[in-house]
Amino acid sequence: MFRLFLFAMSGALLLAQPIKVEIFEKLNATQLLAPPSDAVPVETYQEPAFAFVRIPTKFSGNALPMDRSTPFGLRATYERILTAGEYRFRLRARGAARLEIDGKSIAEAKPQPPNTTGDDPVPPPPVREDSQLRPAQYPHQDILYRVTLPAGNHKFVLTAVIGGKGLYPTPGELSVSFAQIGQLERLLGPPTAPFLTDDEWDRYVIAVNKKHDAADIVRRRLASVAVAAEWKTRHETIRAELLKTPAPLVPALKSALPVNNDIDRFIGAKMETEAVQPTALTTDLEFLRRLSLDATGVIPTPAEIRAYLADAPKTRRAKAIERVLASSGWADHWVAYWQDVLAENPGILKPDLNNTGPFRWWIHQSFADGIPFDRFVAELLSMEGSAYQGGPAGFAQATLNDAPMAAKAEIVAQAFLGQKMGCARCHDAPFHPFKQKDLFSLAAMMQGKDLKLPKTSTVPMIEGGRKPAVVVALKPGQAIGPEWPFATLINHSESGQLPNQAEVPSRNEVAALIISPNNKRFPQVIVNRIWKRYLGVGFVEPADDWSRGKASHPELLDYLSREFVTSGYDVKHVARLIFSSHLYQRKPVADPATSTGAKGRLFTGPIRRNMTAEQLVDSLHLGTGRAYECEDMNLNPSGDRSPNQFLNLGKPARAWQMTALSNERDRPALALPIAQSIVDVMSVFGWRQSRQNAATSRDDAPSPMQTLILANGIMGTRMVRLSDDSELTELALADMPLDKMMTEMFLRVLSRPPAAEELRVMSNLLGDLYPQRRVKGAKKVDATMKSDNRVSWSNHLSAEATVIRMEEERTLRLGAKPTTRLEPRFRERLEDALWAMVNSPEFVMVP
């Protein structure tokens, strides 16, 4: 029974129920438009109005994102009391849909045909019936119907077919709006439903997406309750057994080296042996900036800085650690790391070498939900869920690869066991202890059956030619059976059972062997990865190739590995220990070269680091107060092609959501100019556009190009432009003294107040114009750039599509239109000051 809502409109009291929405699957298109009476919906939920831009994510029993049937259907039902009169109803739908009023069909939309061409004409621009009404977006059908309704209660039913063969399974801008003749249309719903205008539609879409984000979190966590309880029981058993064994002995220090926790005691013991001293402690604000970047991927906001400084000095660092560990940014920042390590490589164009599905969304939800890391590995290796909507099944893909599971075996061994097997792909590895058979036997376990060695994965043998310098033991076409190749780490017989069983039993075996409590290597590798991420260098280097390195602090590695396991494989627990240590809180070591080699890694302080590409881009947006403006990561906006051809990765809100733009052929119509300006910066700072292979470390050494692109590039220029969509424009217009405004700007960008000399320089630069900085009568204008969604792969060969994209790029190069609300000379000087702050080494370096 739905709760009744009361609304007052035109002096009359009207009753309205919420919109009930049902999702149906495994029916044909005809049945989906008129579901049989015995059809049972797989999902029932509510929406605030008749605009359906997003469908709830479908989750499996262990909370993996799943695909819905092809096609699936939506039915929305609503009742409302209306006054008598003539009404205009408008149905907008990309595909087949039907609107009924009181049991009578009044409007029907036709099915959307799939598209296979690339030389369609560009459709005409949307037509506005008047200056306010939002036009229908291509390829939506816009169907109008006039009807005279008597006063009283009326029932509205919308049914729609979503997706289908060759189509993308999203609803587009499916909506119903209405109004009495002569009035502006609102979305069908309560009297307070949004008007069908651009501004109100945009606000509605943002609100609905937030609502679905929150609902998806609740639903997937509820779906995961039973499985989570089984994992908890497993962890309690492992913990009880491990606590029966002696813990590593924590050394006692002879000197007065600073100590916050046991990490400092282990580190200090070696420092005493080598007679070296630690670096000094960071200031409170240096620590907060480093902590925020390392834990959440962005610099702290002024509000966070003030909350931090409001805490008592003795407890503020500990409280800050707990705040960042509880932040939503924790999940965002880990995604980018595992995208590299697991070679997540989705493409928004047609498949290229080693493209995967976008399992980034599952990585994010795993860290957001705080699932234990051993469960993370098990779910990854199950390779189940949706391949194109964000599930681990996307990891199984390696397009255009002759042996996809061999590629995945390389990644898994390297990521979780520190075993680099890449050289064993085509022959026995000459410098690693692996044979080609080892790699393919692990691949066969992940495949769930024997694998035949592809001819293209062998070294060609030319009759009478020179004998290869490598050993080629396998022949093309030879079958290799499933077999565990790492008996030196753990015997196959020790695999055990896991709470959630994969559909392919041998994949379950691989996961069980990797995360077994008897496999000491797994927790050591993960702890080493976490340590390297926060301190700049690992106990073992390279972190992904343990056959080449020895641990610099084996006892501390064992100690942290034990902590990791007894905590229930909780990454946050290890992070908390590291963040709380005096070592992490020290000033960085100036010269990384002094810390190379196991003997030289004394950890007198963290290694000096620059921001990662993702940290830089996200912090630039946050620090300069700009929204993440970018096109959708989608070259199929009309939705008339299937996900296995063209992915829709949505509109990015963080840098990890970017992807390769796949326009190597330099077709201007396929360009996404704003996204390209962001990708250009990220690439120069070490981000990999194409992750065809796994990587733990990036090629991100400082270079002149980094300085040049930040100082002169499109994105850097756009960030410092004071336009009407910049928060810093509002700051400059606020009623406050100049020194307070500059303090706020320094806090935003550099996470500290300005020094006295900096304030003097800023006062000399801006002081004479500051009192007259506001322009009377100037109005705020919409400065956001918008992409023309008429351009897609389907028409990218047309000259008009090229002209549209080239004009968008030209506009982008000109930059956002400066605000007219600030006096031009003052605005330009303030932009110069902001440019200097953003381009200072202090901004890019992690304290």
Which residue ranges define each predicted feature?
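Sec-dependent signal peptide recognition
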Residues: 1-8
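Boundary at the C-terminal end of the N-terminal hydrophobic targeting segment
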Residues: 8, 14-16
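Acidic/polar, compositionally biased interaction segments
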Residues: 17-210
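N-terminal pre-domain segments of enzymes
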Residues: 195-258
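Short, structured secondary-structure elements
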Residues: 237-487, 508, 519-561, 571, ...
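Glycine- and hydrophobic-rich flexible loops that cap the catalytic core of alpha/beta enzyme folds
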Residues: 503
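Extended, well-ordered alpha-helical scaffold/bundle regions in very large, multi-domain proteins
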Residues: 753-759
